[in-house]
Design a protein with these regions (language model features):
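N-terminal presequence-like segments and the immediate start of the first folded domain
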Residues: 4-140, 146-196
Length: 196
């Protein structure tokens, strides 16, 4: 989902409302700030991906397997979403941010060091994938939102920080530089898909 704003106070009410439409354990989620929405006046937008099966002429639920490594943070408000979920042979991670380990206070780590935040955040994404018995070489896609001045140098530095956590060939990357992320203290959000 996307929300118009750049503070926890702007994120929380809309996120809490969206969460009422999902039961725990809900699919992994990502919520990032945006700076313009269409139509004008909109304050949130939701995108969703869904997987169902078709068997004997009927629409069927696909069994899910979820993981939440102990080190990975929790939201500062109650949410039904899981941090990682496997459906068939695909592992989806929720959007990871540089929050304190195993906490739900919404406090950022490595404040003022965007590259350290990128590496730290990728550590969470890697932990989730590894909880399913997979490695960084199983990534099929990483989607990275990050605060940036939009320069090539800033993008290359960000990709370098991500590459250092992968330890091999990079998967396909979707890079979304933004003038500002969630707050001045949180400069990155990353989610991924892995073969599982």
């Amino acid at each position: 989902s996307y929300y118009f704003g750049a503070t926890l106070d702007e994120w929380a009410p809309m996120s809490a409302r969206r969460a009422t439409y999902f039961r725990e354990p809900a699919a992994p989620s990502t919520s990032v700030p945006c700076h313009a929405l269409y139509p004008p006046g909109s304050i949130t937008m939701i995108e969703a991906l869904a997987m169902r099966d078709h068997l004997n002429g009927f629409d069927k639920y696909i069994p899910r397997d979820d993981r939440w490594p102990e080190r990975v943070w929790d939201w500062p408000i109650e949410m039904p979403y899981r941090q990682g979920m496997r459906l068939r042979n695909m592992i989806w991670t929720g959007g990871q941010v540089p929050f304190e380990e195993a906490m739900n206070q919404g406090k950022a780590v490595h404040v003022g060091d965007p590259l350290a935040q990128a590496s730290f955040t990728m550590g969470y994404v890697n932990d989730i994938v590894e909880a399913f018995g997979k490695t960084t070489q199983d990534y099929a896609l990483l989607v990275c939102y990050f605060a940036s001045d939009g320069s090539q140098a800033a993008t290359e530095a960000f990709v370098g920080a991500i590459a250092d956590t992968i330890g091999g060939e990079l998967p396909p990357l979707t890079l979304v530089p933004q003038p500002k992320m969630h707050s001045d203290d949180i400069t990155v959000e990353i989610w991924g898909v892995a073969k599982g």
